[in-house]
C-alpha cells in the first residue's frame, strides 16, 4: 500500500476446486486487500475460477464495496499454458478443474493427451513439456458467457500467459531484432 503499486496476485485454489484449501483464494485476496489497503490485482481470474467465476467476482465486488482497490485480468480465450508437470494437471486433480486428459495439448508437437495413462507417462518422463490446457470451450454458450463475464468485470484487463514462443520448425525464441519471419507484434510495442 505504501508503494502505491498493485500486487499481481496468483491466488490459491478456490474452495469449489479444493475443499481442503486453508482459505478460498478469492476470499484471501479480499481479506488481504481490506487488511493492508494494498491494490490487489488478481491474475488470470477466469482460469483460476473457471466455471465458478460468478461467485469469485461477487467476492471481489464485496471487497470493492468495502473500499478496497481490486482489479483483475483475464485471457480473451478459454485456454492457458503451463508445464505438463504442474500440480493441478495430476490425473487425480483433473475432475476439480472439470477437464479430462483430452483438454491438454502438448507443445510444440500438437499431441492431444489421449488418456490418463499417457498423461502419467508424459508427466513422469518430461514434466517440463509445455502444454495448452483448455478449461472453457469458447464454442459452448455457457462457457463463452463465463469467459465474457470475466472480461467485462469492472477494471478487468486483457492478459496473456507470458509463455515462451514455440515455433513450428522447432527453433527457440530469441531476442533477435527485427522479429524473425513469421513473427508479429502490435505496432505500439514494435520499438
Which ranges hold each PLM region?
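Hydrophobic, small-residue-rich alpha-helical packing segments that form membrane-like cores
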Residues: 1-35
Amino acid at each position: 500500500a505504501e508503494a502505491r503499486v498493485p500486487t499481481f496476485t496468483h491466488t490459491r485454489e478456490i474452495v469449489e476446486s479444493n475443499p481442503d484449501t486453508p482459505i478460498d483464494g478469492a476470499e484471501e485476496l479480499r481479506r488481504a486487500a481490506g487488511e493492508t489497503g494494498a491494490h490487489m490485482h488478481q491474475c488470470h481470474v477466469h482460469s483460476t475460477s473457471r466455471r465458478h467465476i460468478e461467485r469469485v467476482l461477487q467476492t471481489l465486488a464485496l471487497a470493492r464495496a468495502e473500499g478496497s482497490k481490486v482489479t483483475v485480468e483475464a485471457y480473451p480465450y478459454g485456454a492457458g499454458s503451463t508445464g505438463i508437470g504442474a500440480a493441478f494437471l495430476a490425473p487425480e486433480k483433473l475432475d476439480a478443474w472439470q477437464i479430462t486428459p483430452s483438454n491438454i495439448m502438448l507443445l510444440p508437437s500438437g499431441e492431444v493427451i489421449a488418456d490418463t495413462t499417457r498423461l502419467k507417462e508424459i508427466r513422469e518422463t518430461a514434466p517440463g513439456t509445455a502444454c495448452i490446457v483448455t478449461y472453457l470451450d469458447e464454442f459452448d454458450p455457457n462457457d463463452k458467457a463465463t469467459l465474457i463475464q470475466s472480461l467485462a468485470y469492472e477494471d478487468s484487463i486483457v492478459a496473456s500467459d507470458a509463455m515462451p514462443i514455440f515455433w513450428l520448425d522447432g527453433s527457440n525464441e530469441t531476442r533477435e531484432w527485427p522479429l524473425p519471419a513469421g513473427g508479429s507484434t502490435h505496432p505500439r510495442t514494435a520499438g
